[in-house]
Amino acid sequence: DDDTVDRTELAKELSHKYTEILIDEYQDTNKAQDMLFRAISDNEENLFIVGDVKQSIYGFRLAMPEIFLQKRKHLPDFNGKNYPAKINLDENFRSRKEVTEYINYVFSRVMSEDSCGINYDDSESLKAGADYEKSAFPCAELHIVDKSKIDCEYLPEASHIADIINKLVAEKMPVKTKSGYRPVMYKDICILMRGLNDADDYFD
């Protein structure tokens, strides 16, 4: 459990080759990777890591998001001079305000110190960094599926999603393109899944 790094001569030699070391998606690193990155850095002073615990998806290959959490917890805020330190990038420029508000609402209720190692409070919340044209349609919806009320041969969730998609297409919900607006088409819609175990039901 000791996370100290005893640098080999090779690690020291390699560290001289890198002015800066930048690692993205650090929430998905494991202990071995973390120690390797630290070993080839200059006492971590030139090691720049970026991560978001909410996006950790590689548990199947032993990702340890708690490594990133511990660094965030113990590093001081960057004062413009001293390293290592942390910088909180909480502004989101790619999403509507309604989306960031929805994300904050959901995660503030499901993420806690006990369950995820982090309390999702105001200091963790996303801030909308850009203004977008107001939409007449909801940017996000949360559907609770009552499986007992859906009688079908497929997964209730798959059937429910199919109904939503068919309704959007039937009602010709407008989507914005470079040349203006047009009715939504099936090819515009993407279904994100946690895994492929039940993919056949969704395909059907």
Name the predicted role of every residue range.
Residues E9, E13-I23, Q27-D204:
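Conserved motor-region signature of P-loop NTPase helicases/translocases
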